[in-house]
């Protein structure tokens, strides 16, 4: 009798660059830091803020055409996540890899204007028409994080543009 062995799909390694981190506070404020550049973020509540941070990470992932690593601190806990260009959010393994995306769906969150649930990758709310329905950036005289060109996100001396989260140990709103 011949034995068959299941073939496991290789797990995807998520690079540690760019460095994306977020700090989320209970009052719906926090910070989003990309490669050392910290920007304030704010929303009406924590749920809107989480979705907005994930939306920013998904936009960065889409520009880089690969998942990005997101470290989220929501005291007292910290999670290391990966956000895919499609808006799917996953916990990273201890080896910094991601399991298959099979069966997972993009993160959804409420529009900042009308509250209608939609994928974090939505550029315009289909219900109220507002652009960037998950935007949480607080603009203080500089470009919004999403306005930064991909060229500003490269490591000096390279052209490589190779990497957000939430939860109770699991990924929230990943329905």
Segments the model singles out, each with a brief description of its role:
Residues 2-132, 175:
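Hydrophobic alpha-helical segments that drive targeting, anchoring, or assembly
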Residues 41-44, 137-175:
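Long, charge-rich boundary regions
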């Amino acid at each position: 009798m011949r034995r068959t062995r299941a073939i496991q799909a290789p797990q995807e390694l998520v690079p540690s660059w760019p460095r994306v981190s977020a700090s989320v506070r209970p009052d719906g404020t926090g910070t989003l830091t990309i490669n050392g550049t910290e920007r304030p973020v704010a929303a009406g509540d924590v749920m809107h803020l989480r979705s907005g941070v994930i939306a920013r990470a998904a936009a960065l992932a889409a520009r880089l055409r690969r998942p990005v690593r997101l470290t989220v601190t929501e005291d007292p806990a910290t999670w290391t996540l990966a956000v895919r260009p499609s808006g799917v959010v996953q916990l990273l393994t201890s080896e910094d890899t991601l399991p298959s995306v099979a069966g997972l769906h993009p993160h959804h969150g409420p529009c900042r204007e009308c509250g209608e649930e939609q994928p974090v990758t939505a550029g315009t709310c289909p219900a109220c028409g507002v652009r960037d329905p998950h935007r949480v950036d607080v603009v203080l005289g500089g470009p919004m994080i999403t306005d930064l060109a991909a060229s500003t996100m490269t490591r000096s001396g390279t052209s490589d543009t190779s990497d957000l989260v939430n939860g109770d140990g699991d990924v929230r709103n990943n329905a």
